[in-house]
UniProtKB/Swiss-Prot annotation:
Transport keyword on record: no
Polar residues composition bias: residue spans: 83-93
Annotated region (Disordered), positions in chain: 64-93
Pfam families: Cyclin_C, Cyclin_N
UniProt name for this protein: G2/mitotic-specific cyclin-A
InterPro entries reported in the protein's UniProt record: Cyclin, Cyclin-like_dom, Cyclin-like_sf, Cyclin_A/B-like, Cyclin_C-dom, Cyclin_N, Cyclins_cyclin-box
Origin superkingdom: Eukaryota
Family annotation (SUPFAM superfamilies): Cyclin-like
Signal peptide: none
Amino acid sequence: LFFQKKYFLDKQLNQNAIQIYQDNLTNQNNNIGKKAKLEDEKHAHNKSITSKYKRVPLASISNVQGSRIQPTRAAKEKLKPPQNISDSQLVNDSLKSSNSIQAHNTKNDLHKENLYNESALDTFKESPMVFSPFLSDSSCKKYSSLNGIQDIDSKLHEVFELPEYAQDIHNYLKKSEAKYRPKSNYMRKQTDINSSMRAILIDWLVEVSEEYKLIPQTLYLSVSYIDRFLSHMSVLRGKLQLVGAACMLVAAKFEEIYPPEVAEFVYITDDTYTAKQVLRMEHLILKTLAFDLSVPTCRDFLSRYLFAANAKPESQLKYLAEYLSELTLINCDISVKYAPSMIAASSICVANHMLNSIPWTPTLEFYSGYNIQDLRSCLNEIHLLHLAASTNPQQAIQQKYKSPKFGCVSSLVPLEMPCF
């Protein structure tokens, strides 16, 4: 018992000694912290006293005018309007402080402000910077009234129409269409197929696109893939339908939200080919095209040119131009010989001639980049194609545009084209 009591007593003494040591250490740290804090406060106080006499308070820094000419002040002097269209009040208003309260502008003041803005833009004519036509409403009006050309991009209000970039996108597509054009004489090098077989294939694809309610761009891409593939590969007539089915499968995967499955393409070929054959042909097509699937088609240009022609969303002009452009898909000579943008422009020109008095306007010429002389050859061929549409053996497009859904435009009687 004696040793046990002694053990517990020693243990308690040791714990008390440890606690006293920790308390002393804490007090020392607190003293060091207080001393450092006092030194920081003293340093900050001294700094504020010295800075008081060396810098201007932020509240009044805008009122201090040094000897150096400020950039903003120099710019205002440069943009000062001529004396014959301004007065002293206009100059004083431009130099007022931002902190002052400005009165509401009267009609006279607004007129002077517009004159000032126009003169300011005139001073930058010699500047290397290029002003965008989308800067202001006044500049848009000046831009659209140039030579009777309408500013169609200022009418675009949808989120994805991008009026600031619409013309740049169009210019890029026109440059790209030359890169992805099929060879103009590829059908002459095919030993087992000809243009008539190609026309039958495209006519069948039109029926397939209507059966599965595919968007028009899918059909145009399918034809583009077929022509580009046949430009590099020689195909037997027994495999031509397989090429068409595989090309439409690729185009549907690229454009559609819910594309038809492989089994459906096997079904529409009446089980002529197996699913494995369709997939193998799809692989060969992608390899031959080097996976360049996003290519310009006639449909890309047609939508913009229709907008430039003031065509309403469900107008006969729109449906007739679409009908004529689809007719060119069947004709190998036209679809391969001419660029998609030229076919789109010529289709609108022929449709305008049938429905309106003016076939080609300055606005269409400005936004398409084609004048009427550039389109002469393509216009004549599309017109002849339109005249022979009713007697053509391939009637899928003719029947498609006979429906009221498309304004029955294929029933319209073609007119004689004037000599341009």
